[in-house]
């Protein structure tokens, strides 16, 4: 979207009794034993890690999911420049990219 690899909306790692797997694309790591799953990377919309699955203890809680992100890409010639909030605005070749990580709007 922005000319360099960016990963969004990855799943969280699963919980297990011995070792939890790592989440992909910004997802949180899985919990180990009765441990808690790791939180996902912020502003990626990714899932949190799964809780631990220890058979002899309390199950650990799953990690928090990543906060959301909205990305709008358009030809720079179509970009009106009318925004609210605080989007990150970048130009990539002949495209303009708006990235919102909090409330805002874009008017065509």
What are these regions (language model features)?
Residues 1-108:
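Low-complexity, glycine/proline-biased repetitive segments and flexible coils/loops
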């Amino acid at each position: 979207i922005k000319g360099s690899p960016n990963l969004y909306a990855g799943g969280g790692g699963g919980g297990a009794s011995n070792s939890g797997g790592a989440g992909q694309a910004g997802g949180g790591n899985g919990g180990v034993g009765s441990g808690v799953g790791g939180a996902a990377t912020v502003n990626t919309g990714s899932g949190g890690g799964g809780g631990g699955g220890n058979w002899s203890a309390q199950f650990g809680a799953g990690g928090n999911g990543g906060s959301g992100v909205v990305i709008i890409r358009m030809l720079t010639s179509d970009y009106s420049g009318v925004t609210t909030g605080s989007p990150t605005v970048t130009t990539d070749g002949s495209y303009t990219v708006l990235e919102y990580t909090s409330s805002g709007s874009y008017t065509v």
